């Protein structure tokens, strides 16, 4: 608004960081062939696919061990964990940090959550709750970090194209996640006398998909000159 605090010089220049990368804009025909976009869209889509697929079945997998009421509170705890995870990234990520590495770390935390669910075997309550906290911590960052990565890697003109593209790819991909994870849950063989809440193949699938998402983010890191 052009206003300044009392005592400041009226024309004092504010120090600001650029909102996007100084990279040159890409021709419209080359956007989909850009390695950064391909790896960013792939990493986001895979991460969302694993996340939505697992979350769609999480409540029903918690019920056998926690009962419906406590399972509802636990599922709500994932949302609280998501808020905390997003806040921590906001505090810890420097303005000029390699945001892809933070995206990789975010998926790594969720992978640990999937493994906690796996080793809980459907009835180890402390591990189930640990899984909720770890997996939930990445929920918000999975959607917020990819646009921030695009902002750091693409020119201002390209950001307005890249962000809608990666979001559309992610949405089109994760729309099928609940059904695919449901098929895994129903058709995969059971492990011995596992409890009703055990779904080892589902949690393994989530972890493996997110490992692929980590790889996609990592190999797309811009090369330093």
Kindly give the residue locations of the regions a language model identified.
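Juxtamembrane intracellular "pre-TM" segments in multi-pass secondary transporters
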Residues: 10-37
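A membrane-interface helix-boundary motif in multi-pass transporters
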Residues: 183-209
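Structural signature of the two symmetry-related core transmembrane helices
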Residues: 101-116
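Extracytoplasmic gate region of multi-pass secondary transporters
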Residues: 34-90, 177-178
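Hydrophobic core of transmembrane alpha-helices in multi-pass small-molecule transporters
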Residues: 45, 127-141
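Multi-pass alpha-helical transporter architecture, strongest
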Residues: 204-225
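Helix-to-loop junctions at the C-terminal end of transmembrane segments
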Residues: 85-98, 185
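A late C-terminal transmembrane helix in Major Facilitator Superfamily
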Residues: 139, 153-190
């Amino acid at each position: 608004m052009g206003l300044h605090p009392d005592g400041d010089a009226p024309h004092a220049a504010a120090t600001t960081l650029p909102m996007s990368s100084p990279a040159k804009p890409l021709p419209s025909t080359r956007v989909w062939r850009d390695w950064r976009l391909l790896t960013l869209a792939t990493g986001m889509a895979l991460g969302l696919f694993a996340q939505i697929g697992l979350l769609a079945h999480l409540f029903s997998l918690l019920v056998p061990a926690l009962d419906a009421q406590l399972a509802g509170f636990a599922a709500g705890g994932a949302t609280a964990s998501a808020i905390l995870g997003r806040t921590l990234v906001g505090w810890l990520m420097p303005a000029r940090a390699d945001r892809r590495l933070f995206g990789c770390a975010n998926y790594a935390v969720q992978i640990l959550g999937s493994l906690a669910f796996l080793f809980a075997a459907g009835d180890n309550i402390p591990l189930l709750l640990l899984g909720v906290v770890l997996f939930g911590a990445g929920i918000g960052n999975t959607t917020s970090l990819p646009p921030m990565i695009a902002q750091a890697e693409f020119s201002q003109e390209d950001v307005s194209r890249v962000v809608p593209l990666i979001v559309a790819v992610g949405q089109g991909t994760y729309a099928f996640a609940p059904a695919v994870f449901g098929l895994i849950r129903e058709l995969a063989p059971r492990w011995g006398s596992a409890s009703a809440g055990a779904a080892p193949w589902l949690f393994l699938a989530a972890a493996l998909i997110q490992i692929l998402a980590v790889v996609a983010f990592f190999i797309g890191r811009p090369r330093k000159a």
